[in-house]
């Protein structure tokens, strides 16, 4: 039976990738259908109750700059906001919000249900309808068929998902939800490379059974950040603290004594887990010299007693999980509400995708999210947005669009996946981007909002606000260029009081702002440079653009030079252990692959352009920088 209406775009799955994938073509004016197995879990935070972080916060801002939902939902659900790396340079500063799961899911559903051109239907999809090498619809479990010109698959961990708790396992997409087995079997018949990955989650703890009085509190920032460029602190709900406890030798002894009951160490789980979010079993074994690991006790919401113990993801049996939890300070009488578990699932080799996230073998079929080998809500949402945009452009027979590496972290993510592939769950870090001084959280709108406007993704209110901000930035930069202070000025004494060294020659406002001891607030407190601008976002842009101008230009030159070193030889017995600045992951991969040239090294999965720069410097220092034949 065919559904009475035809659609331009169908999205399968209502998680973080699926919601962004559905909203984008709908905003572009295309008739879109979102199919989900359960409308009550749209926007569900299946693992940790948080949005943002290093690299991830950058993705959230980019999604927002293009009219996406994640930042707005986080602003409305965030119960603790922090700016990470606030004392470091602007390239690595990142926003993170602890989120109320219920409020987040509520914000997502409201946005979806109020979006024009978007329908939602609850049914599991079991098959994809193909006409030779082109997708033309889907089939649901009840036999209902839907026609569409493009289909986006965002199935998360549901494809042949298998949940492990100790040596017991059963099929499931996540705790409480069924796996998508029929669709997984159908996809395995297609010309796509499939493999298995795994991820895990910690047990959830009853807050009423924790002794918080003996634990350290962690509050959010006093000056609360916001994620969305259209957001406001007024949108934030009540802010609450997290708490910190630690594992100890007793905890580690419990884990070591029960490794034979771990599905990972017993060889039952075949999928590779996320390197940067390891299970507590992995942490204890990999870092055996450490006798303690910090654990963050994160509230799951304002109206929930559930606590998420960030740092003890595990698939050990329930009785062992209880011993682990009860071994920690403040947790001696803690009770588990939900057991931790590991989940294995199908993912597709992202090298079989175009940079638009359309499959190379089937026209009009797009993949986004964890099924492409990534981990994290933000990575999924970024892919969903990109797939949604390109599905919309495909339907309209318009030229595809995807961001370059120098345009967005979404561009870095997709380029890494489609060019290099991945054998382990991929997450974004600022260190993966060679252009990170250009790809800051604060300038995501200037990088991407004009493109979003061209694509029809943002409304006129956002466009007008963006243009006003850009105008404010340009006018203020012009003003600071035109105001000069000279050694004979009547304001010299006032200026010298705040300058690290006395002014000996004429300087503009921009020249003074470049000084390390100077910032915009101090500069505009000086009589010649008053008044200060009210637009704080524009102020931040002005200050960063002036202070980091030289660094940005230097980085662009570095990239051009790096391209010239494609054939630079690496000695066969080069010692990577002496190269300072390489991450353990990169060093291990270089040792394993032993590339013969810089070009070859740059194409190893996980070896970042930033790592290549470090390697080039080391080769030069050791007198080994020679071009290949």
UniProtKB/Swiss-Prot annotation:
Q: What does this protein do?
A: NAD-binding protein involved in the addition of a carboxymethylaminomethyl (cmnm) group at the wobble position (U34) of certain tRNAs, forming tRNA-cmnm(5)s(2)U34.
Record family assignment? Belongs to the MnmG family.
Q: Name one Pfam family in it.
A: SAM_GIDA_C
Species name for this entry? Pasteurella multocida (strain Pm70)
Cofactors required: FAD
Record's signal peptide: none
Can you say what this protein is called? tRNA uridine 5-carboxymethylaminomethyl modification enzyme MnmG
> Is the ATP-binding keyword given for this protein?
no
The biological process GO terms on file are: tRNA methylation; tRNA wobble uridine modification
How is this protein organized at the quaternary level? Homodimer. Heterotetramer of two MnmE and two MnmG subunits.
Compartment annotation? Cytoplasm
Q: Name one GO cellular component term.
A: cytosol
What InterPro entries does the record tag this protein with? FAD/NAD-bd_sf, GIDA_C_N, MnmG, MnmG-rel, MnmG-rel_CS, MnmG_C, MnmG_C_subdom, MnmG_C_subdom_sf
Q: Which UniProt keywords apply?
A: Cytoplasm, FAD, Flavoprotein, NAD, tRNA processing
Residues reported to bind NAD(+): 273-287
Q: Which residues bind FAD?
A: 13-18, 125, 180, 370
Q: Which GO terms describe its molecular function?
A: flavin adenine dinucleotide binding
